[in-house]
């Protein structure tokens, strides 16, 4: 590659990183949070629910839900799983309105205290247009990955080490290149699946009206393979045995892992029951993998599956489990892959943060005004978001359950994040302010883990979900370590070695 082409790739990588880096950090951090949140449902429950106990029959829990006012005619029952031992009852739109303790049938508090950051990642609180906007950042990440690989192609021989003793700037450059090169497969996975998740949905919505003029909903029915409509048959004589139906399905398809039971026309003689889940070796979700049964006698009627469908449709279906680390179809290795997926999400956030830092330091030396503007945005938006997430976790675990408390927690999140942004725009020493934010965030995450562990020991007599507590404490310690003021000699600008061109 000639010098002019290399210079253009450098300019693209630096310019795109500076222009989009702050928003990209928000997308990456909120995405990593979303992944962790899905595995922390049980962490938000009362600790006693996670203790192994005999469970009530599913029919008894369904009757309990009906007594509490849940409409079961067309409902979705999310079965207990290791990361959330509760059984949840949701409507046809999959909005869950009730959670029960499967051992006692007692109602459980909502676990949606941290969904504000999940919604931030999925839609930016803007509905479907926000989902499309977020997916565009997958394309931005892909462009940055390609440009970074071209820029650092000579760094492959040194990609296994991070040099020390050459100053903070060189160490951060090496860390940035190390994450980018070794984490490239995961970064491409995040970017590609993230872009397809939103843009694929946009294409489906746009083409549905063309494929089925006047009846666009038929496109979604064909995509999902929903059960055929049935006529009303009057009230049934007795309710079916759902546990027996689950056992029958397990005997028929032993490689299938049930996740939900979907009720259609419950209470009618022609009621149908779908068992949704995932199959071993098939990258799909419970939305597309379903077994249909007649409720009254348990007769199997049909299977809906992505297996055997067109290549592009199967690729589109596989996007969600790959993007959100839903590796249940992998088997025993699924948990390890999910942890690795999460760690690479954190690494992607560090990649973005180090890139922003290097660009700001390079431009701040000649007192470039754009560097000061970007520094204020990066410190306030990125550092403030990390702190707001920690405050949300700590306060959410320390405060009692209640609707008013949930509302106050949402206000706390926005107040902390907004306050961090406002102060970052006003303070003169933004590096010192960033260290303050990181110290506060580190303390918040560590206290969140310690608080839950203490509550678990008091309420259940054992440290349930201790790996999550340990991860929170470790992340808090990492933030506290990173917030330490660097030594004066480490802050001196070192000469960048050959092949380590600064941003």
Specify the residue positions occupied by each region the protein language model found.
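Conserved histidines in hydrophobic membrane contexts and catalytic metal-binding motifs
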Residues: 1-503
């Amino acid at each position: 590659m000639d010098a002019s082409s290399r210079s253009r790739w450098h300019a693209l990588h630096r310019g795109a990183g500076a222009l989009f880096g702050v928003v990209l950090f928000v997308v990456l951090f909120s995405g990593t949070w979303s992944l962790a949140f899905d595995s922390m449902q049980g962490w938000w429950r009362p600790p006693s629910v996670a203790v192994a106990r005999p469970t009530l029959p599913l029919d008894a829990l369904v009757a309990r839900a009906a007594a509490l006012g849940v409409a079961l005619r067309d409902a979705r029952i999310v079965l207990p799983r290791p990361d959330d031992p509760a059984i949840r009852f949701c409507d046809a739109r999959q909005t869950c309105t009730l959670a029960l303790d499967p051992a006692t049938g007692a109602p459980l508090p909502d676990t949606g205290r941290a969904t504000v950051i999940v919604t931030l990642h999925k839609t930016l609180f803007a509905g479907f247009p926000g989902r499309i906007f977020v997916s565009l950042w997958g394309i931005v990440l892909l462009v940055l990955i390609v440009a970074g690989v071209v820029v650092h192609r000579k760094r492959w021989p040194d990609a296994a080490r991070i040099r020390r003793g050459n100053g903070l700037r060189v160490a951060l450059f090496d860390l940035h290149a190390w994450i980018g090169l070794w984490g490239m497969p995961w970064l491409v996975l995040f970017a590609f699946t993230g872009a397809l998740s939103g843009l694929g949905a946009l294409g489906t919505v746009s083409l549905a009206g063309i494929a089925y003029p006047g009846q666009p909903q038929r496109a979604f029915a064909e995509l999902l393979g929903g059960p055929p409509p049935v006529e009303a048959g009057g009230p049934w004589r007795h309710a079916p045995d759902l546990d027996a139906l689950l056992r029958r399905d397990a005997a028929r398809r032993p490689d299938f892992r049930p996740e939900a039971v979907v009720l259609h026309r419950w209470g009618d003689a022609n009621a149908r029951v779908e068992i949704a889940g995932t199959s071993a070796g098939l990258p799909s979700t419970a939305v597309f993998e379903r077994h249909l049964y007649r409720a009254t006698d348990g007769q199997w009627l049909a299977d809906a599956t992505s297996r055997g469908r067109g290549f592009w449709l199967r690729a589109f279906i596989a996007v969600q489990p790959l993007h959100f680390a839903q590796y249940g179809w992998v088997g025993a290795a699924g948990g390890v892959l999910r942890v690795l997926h999460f760690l690479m999400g954190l690494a992607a956030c560090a990649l973005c943060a180090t890139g922003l830092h290097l660009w700001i330091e390079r431009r701040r030396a000649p007192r470039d005004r754009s560097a000061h503007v970007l520094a204020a945005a990066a410190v306030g938006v990125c550092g403030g978001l990390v702190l707001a997430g920690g405050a949300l976790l700590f306060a959410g675990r320390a405060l009692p359950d209640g609707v008013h408390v949930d509302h106050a927690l949402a206000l706390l999140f926005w107040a902390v994040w907004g306050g961090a942004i406002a102060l970052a725009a006003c303070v003169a020493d933004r590096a010192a302010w960033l260290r303050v934010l990181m110290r506060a965030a580190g303390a918040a995450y560590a206290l969140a883990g310690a608080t839950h562990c203490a509550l678990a020991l008091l309420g259940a007599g054992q440290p349930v979900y201790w790996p999550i507590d340990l991860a929170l404490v470790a992340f808090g310690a990492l933030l506290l370590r990173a917030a330490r003021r660097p030594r004066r000699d480490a802050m001196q600008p070192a000469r960048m070695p050959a092949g380590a061109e600064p941003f």
